[in-house]
């Protein structure tokens, strides 16, 4: 009798365990396996963990690391020819630069000898104290929890539900990952670039933008040392830094708030640490095109494919980017100012602003 009870109990326990773990494996919210194999849409939850799980599936095949914020997630590894890159860029808060060193060190421990380091350098990393919002196992250079310990948890059920439910907030995010774990625009939701212009107009009280009118939050050089610390982890690698594109509206806001000088100073000083450095935030046919971005901060995969070619081949850099390493600071500053202060740009921006805020 007892033996039958034990068999029945074991069978029931196995059934319950399977009912919990099988959906979690099929939707794979923590990217231990192949991600969501049912409809190939992978929302992001905690990229600081999921990307480590993805990386550790075959760490020795990588000789190149890409780091940065959520903007840089659109720089797919295949856009960098001649290397086997892993994109470890993650969604960021102010001061995310403090995390880069730890992810770089972790990559060095488990990968092959790195030959190339690519880093996105973003304006918000000069506006706050460094963040260290990283998993403890990354800090300690250890492996993450095994999949079977995660996928029998209630937390895993919750995340699996968010992946499976096409109406969930996570599935409707404007940025998701595809079946190849490449960040892509989510066609279920596209925000309007006009929203950023409206925010700027409200912040600086109108559309009559002819000169800086008030001092905004300045940019501090204090965090530059963290880029230096990161680069020191890659003594034999070629290092490429770049400023990701941001809507010209965002750069114009920095200009109007009187903090452009501090912004450019920090970018230029950081650029000196890298072997190669490009600034894609200048006014250009990319940053002035609202169809290429859903919020003025995140640009399309097609845009980053062009960026990848410029970073490795310098093809087309003259129009879309500034090769900061090839010029002095004053030349760099004057180039940016010339584009921002052109009458054509100001007139067009003025008309667009008035249309958006309804003047």
Feature names for model-found ranges:
Residues 26-50:
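Alpha-helical transmembrane signal-anchor/signal-peptide segments
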Residues 61, 66-152:
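Membrane-embedded segments
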Residues 97-104, 217-227, 257-270:
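Well-ordered, non-membrane alpha-helical segments in soluble/globular domains
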Residues 7-25:
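Hydrophobic membrane-insertion alpha-helices, especially the h-region
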């Amino acid at each position: 009798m007892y033996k039958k009870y034990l068999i029945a109990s074991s069978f029931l326990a196995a059934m319950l365990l399977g009912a919990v773990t099988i959906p979690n494996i099929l939707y794979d919210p923590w990217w231990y396996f192949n991600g969501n194999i049912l409809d190939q849409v992978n929302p992001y939850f905690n990229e600081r963990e999921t990307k480590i799980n993805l990386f550790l599936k075959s760490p020795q095949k990588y000789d190149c690391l890409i780091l940065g914020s959520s903007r840089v997630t659109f720089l797919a590894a295949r856009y960098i020819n001649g290397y086997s890159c892993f994109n470890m860029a993650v969604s960021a808060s102010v001061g995310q630069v403090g995390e880069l060193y730890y992810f770089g060190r972790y990559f060095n421990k488990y990968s092959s000898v790195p030959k190339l380091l690519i880093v996105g350098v973003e304006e918000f990393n000069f506006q706050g104290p460094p963040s260290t919002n990283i998993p403890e196992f990354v800090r300690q250079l250890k492996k993450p929890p095994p999949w079977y310990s995660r996928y029998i948890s209630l937390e895993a059920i919750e995340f699996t539900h968010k992946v499976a439910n096409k109406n969930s907030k996570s599935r409707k995010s404007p940025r998701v990952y595809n079946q190849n774990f490449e960040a892509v625009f989510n066609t279920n939701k596209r925000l309007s670039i006009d929203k950023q212009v409206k925010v700027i107009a409200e912040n600086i009280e109108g559309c009559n933008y002819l000169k800086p009118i008030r001092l905004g939050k300045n940019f501090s050089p204090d965090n530059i040392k963290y880029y230096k610390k990161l680069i020191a982890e890659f003594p034999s690698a070629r290092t490429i830094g770049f400023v990701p594109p941001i809507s010209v509206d965002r750069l114009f806001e920095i200009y109007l708030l009187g903090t452009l000088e501090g912004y450019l100073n920090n970018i230029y000083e950081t650029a000196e640490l890298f072997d190669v450095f490009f600034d894609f935030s200048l006014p250009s046919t990319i940053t002035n095109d609202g169809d290429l971005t859903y919020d003025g901060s995140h640009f399309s995969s097609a845009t980053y494919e062009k960026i990848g070619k410029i970073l490795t081949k310098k093809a087309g850099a003259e129009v879309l980017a500034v090769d900061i390493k090839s010029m002095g600071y004053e030349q760099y500053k004057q180039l940016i100012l010339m584009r921002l202060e052109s009458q054509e740009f100001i007139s067009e921006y003025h008309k667009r602003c008035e249309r958006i805020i309804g003047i």
